[in-house]
């Protein structure tokens, strides 16, 4: 009997989709001079597509799912979380060290900055070197809090947990839009708990997917039905089109539906293998890609002018850079993490 859980391979493939979305989102979510694109109703075609490519909820849901799986198997504790977080930070620090050194020559007015700036970036409190890593520390906080979060979820049930997480997230998002975005609150140490609470809904929903997946949501994939494949592809297209056209704060719902359709869709093995490979490298690709596309090598990346070429070049350099850095970080982790 085929497992009804989202497998590790499925999870890696979804992370692969998420990192492909992330590169697209960060490349084309802003207008850049010199890019040759089609314009529709006063907006570039690629900009129209970016709402469907918002990646953060994908990573949060897969993290919530995976950590809850670890929790119910009795392997989620302070020690395992400390190992997980330290490994994450070793990758983060290595990437930062290399690119900040490069930045000292290319953009000396920005790198390395004051001692306070260095401290905030090293800890992840305020990621001014590479703002797109903003959810690193909030994610770490959720990891450390996850045993208590999951314990509460077991006591009050999944639906009550979702309602509670929704209240926290809505409250945090209101405060962010009302006070942080307007500049009333500028202290990153005050912003941090708000940001963390704002991510809670996606994280808890991922854990709920683990609870529900046994019988309620994930269909067994025992046969490769061509008709089901067509239906799933059409559903994904419609869902993504709605996300692009309906500009409302429903990214979490969109991501949840996308994942449900995706894991129930019969897929080609070759496509899955490519996505899984990107998924395995997604952490470092996330950490490096905007150093190339925004902060240090912007003119080189966008110099290819056409969106497809720009995207492929960034994907290429981010992937192969991640191969090298992951190898170095792996060796460092083996020497540092000995518990």
Q: What does each model-found stretch correspond to?
A:
Residues 44-56, 123-138, 176-205, 239-261, ...:
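Interfacial loop-to-helix transition and helix-capping segments at the boundaries
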Residues 21-34, 103-105:
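Alpha-helical transmembrane segments of multi-pass membrane proteins
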């Amino acid at each position: 009997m085929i497992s009804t859980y989202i497998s590790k391979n499925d999870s890696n493939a979804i992370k692969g989709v998420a990192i492909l979305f992330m590169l697209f989102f960060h490349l084309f979510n802003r207008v850049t001079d010199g890019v040759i694109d089609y314009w529709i109703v006063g907006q570039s075609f690629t900009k129209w597509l970016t709402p469907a490519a918002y990646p953060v909820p994908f990573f949060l849901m897969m993290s919530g799912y995976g950590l809850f799986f670890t929790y119910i198997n009795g392997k989620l504790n302070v020690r395992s979380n400390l190992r997980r977080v330290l490994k994450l930070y070793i990758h983060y620090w290595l990437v930062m060290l290399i690119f900040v050194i490069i930045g000292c020559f290319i953009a000396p007015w920005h790198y390395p900055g004051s001692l306070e700036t260095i401290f905030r970036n090293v800890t992840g409190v305020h990621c001014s070197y590479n703002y797109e890593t903003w959810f690193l520390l909030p994610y770490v906080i959720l990891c450390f809090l996850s045993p208590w979060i999951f314990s509460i979820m077991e006591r009050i049930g999944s639906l009550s947990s979702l309602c509670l997480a929704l209240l926290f997230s809505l409250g945090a998002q209101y405060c962010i839009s009302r006070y942080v975005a307007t500049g009333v609150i500028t202290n990153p140490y005050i912003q941090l708990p708000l940001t963390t609470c704002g991510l809670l809904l996606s994280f808890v929903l991922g854990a709920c997917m683990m609870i529900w997946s046994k019988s309620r949501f994930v269909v067994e994939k025992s046969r490769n039905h061509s008709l089901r494949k067509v239906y799933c592809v059409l559903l994904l297209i419609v869902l993504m089109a709605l996300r692009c056209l309906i500009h409302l704060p429903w990214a979490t719902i969109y991501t949840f539906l996308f994942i449900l359709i995706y894991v129930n869709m019969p897929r080609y093995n070759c496509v899955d293998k490519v996505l899984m490979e990107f998924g395995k490298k997604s952490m470092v690709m996330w950490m490096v890609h905007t150093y190339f596309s925004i902060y240090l090598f912007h003119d080189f990346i966008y110099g290819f002018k056409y969106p497809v070429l720009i995207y492929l070049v960034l994907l290429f350099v981010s992937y192969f850079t991640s191969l090298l850095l992951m190898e170095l970080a792996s060796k460092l982790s083996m020497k540092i993490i000995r518990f």
